[in-house]
Amino acid sequence: MRSFFKQYLFKLFNALSFLIPIKLQLELDSDIDVVILIQKPLGIGDLVMLSPLVILLEEKFIKNNIYIVTEYEKFIDFNRASWIHPSSPKKCSLANSIVISPMLVFTHLEYIFQSKYFIGYFFSNKLTSNFMKSEYKYSLTSGHYFRKIFTILDALDIEYDKENLSYPRIMTTDFTRNSDNVVIAPYVNWEERQFPLSKFVSLIHSLLEICSCKIVLIGSDNPLEVEFNKQLEALVSSSRLDNQTGYTTLLKMSDLISKAKLYIGNDSGPSHIAYLNARRSIVFFGSVRFE
């Protein structure tokens, strides 16, 4: 029991060593794994927005294994990064790794007790690390993804061009060959970003009048999202409306978006996918008047 207590205190001291005004020499040998934490409640939009960070880490640490810890299925085609589910057996050695938390998620906190190095946002909006000292804090209301990851990149001495960040390819599957569909992702988790249900009804009725296309609704199996899209389906009441909400994987959703002649959505995860692979897209940001 005493031995366990001593071991715990040692790990705790090591994890909180960022409070000591020293900077450790970070030397990543090829056997050090780079582990990037992107766990829920972060969404697929967060994964897309953080993808330039993964690409830059791949380019910097060319001899190291790169891992992304996330609950989402693989839908982004990185060059070398492997995906690991948090609940599955770890393919990497956390005790011999650098763990990076680019966003504040409290489930990321447990990893600092297991890793050799850590840097990122683990229990506050302050950048914390056990190999460097930083006073950077991001704004909880206006801090952008890029400002957060730039600070991490600077700490790791990684060069980047703010104006020309690279994005990866979004993966698809052979789910559909129809390119005449209009794909709509009507639901968003944040009320302030939600385009009103009644406006979506008007929009779809207008589309059905002016073109012979089929409208495909997409979304996750989130009960609130399923219910919202069911209401929309009932109010539109058309044989040319196909509600795929809750029935498509991320890869199938990506395939539908990439092959549609038009994508329409809110500021949500599917819209981030559409930004990279849709032929044409319309995205409503905040309270937008349809008229």
Sequence positions of predicted segments:
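Catalytic machinery of carbohydrate-active enzymes
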Residues: 1-291
